[in-house]
């Protein structure tokens, strides 16, 4: 432990493990520690089920009907991977995919007027969908064709829209789309949590809809993937990558002090020993005085013995409740997975509800989502602070990740990873570069 490292990483959340893997591949000497005895930090999957009961201080042990505790791997943070998104690219380029198995989520649903409807995943489904009327469908189709053909590098595809100036609100007007379709597009396809995006330049939204369509095109049922045995497999996959490249891992390591001299980090003290470093990466829990709270997220893990009604008995799905439908500023999400993903006992389903907290009574805010899940066998409620670093870390060389937000995919997490990478190295994160470095070491073409 009394050694000199290029980078020390504290916490084994997904952000930390990916950065640790990338830094190791880049030839840096990395020491990675976590005070917990398990991988994953805030984004861990908890097993056995008994540990989940203890964690949420639920008295007694799980009833017999829950099956064997070891058959459960319950995510603390509900997220899916966009099939064509940044995290999948990171997994492919680093070949961490060899440690993981994925399943396509069976469907995405959207809540409207108290009922849930399937988000169409084919042209035929779109035509048959009762989400919108016939004329609306034609206009919507025209809009989707425009988005599909849109190419940032080819102004001929802009059709009079300036992607850096025209707002999304004006683009919707141009295609004469009604409020329901706008809600559906912004929240179920572009996956925005609020309506702030309407007055922003439209290129970001167009790219998000493209990401959704391209992800959907890869597998057909939905744009989302989920790893067998739970999301806790992801940080472990990147930890393995780091280890292959000489990274050192230590779990169950109490961190006594982050040592700072003249405003810069020089090392970490643990169990009386000091490991020195040039840069430090950590999650907010290790540096409470260097982060600030910008909001809260409520998450409720629900154990069910039945698929969710009106989802065609799907054993995995996502439900989006757009904020307009329930008089809120931000959407409510439901992520559902089940025994089919080796995360629950046979015949059991796990549905996790999440949203950004807006009132003094967060549990009331998510009632519309819980009503869709009835009857619920057991609930585990958590309210977490959203923490962000107070500064960029370029002075102290302490680079702090953000806590996981209420979105149900990893795109914002990947943005944070790329952002920290740039702050640490001064250069943009380049997927292709990553691939070349790996091939140099493995000797592949």
Swiss-Prot record:
The modification Phosphoserine is found at residues 130, 382. It comes from the Eukaryota. The modification N6-succinyllysine is found at residue 57. It is a peripheral membrane protein. Keywords: Acetylation, Cytoplasm, Golgi apparatus, GTPase activation, Membrane, Phosphoprotein. The modification N6-acetyllysine is found at residues 112, 269. GO terms for cellular component: Golgi apparatus; membrane. The modification N-acetylmethionine is found at residue 1. It is found in: Cytoplasm; Membrane; Golgi apparatus, trans-Golgi network. Coiled coil: none annotated. GO terms for molecular function: GTPase activator activity; Rab GDP-dissociation inhibitor activity. InterPro entries: FAD/NAD-bd_sf (IPR036188), GDP_dissociation_inhibitor (IPR018203), RabGDI (IPR000806). The keyword Heme does not apply. GO terms for biological process: negative regulation of cilium assembly; negative regulation of protein localization to cilium; protein transport; small GTPase-mediated signal transduction; vesicle-mediated transport. The keyword Cytoplasm applies. GDP-dissociation inhibitor preventing the GDP to GTP exchange of most Rab proteins. By keeping these small GTPases in their inactive GDP-bound form regulates intracellular membrane trafficking. Negatively regulates protein transport to the cilium and ciliogenesis through the inhibition of RAB8A. Belongs to the Rab GDI family. Interacts with RHOH. Interacts with the GDP-bound inactive forms of RAB3A, RAB3B, RAB3C, RAB5A, RAB5B, RAB5C, RAB8A, RAB8B, RAB10, RAB12, RAB35, and RAB43; binds RAB3D to a lesser extent. Interacts with DZIP1; this interaction negatively regulates the interaction of GDI2 with GDP-bound RAB8A. This is Rab GDP dissociation inhibitor beta. It comes from Pongo abelii.
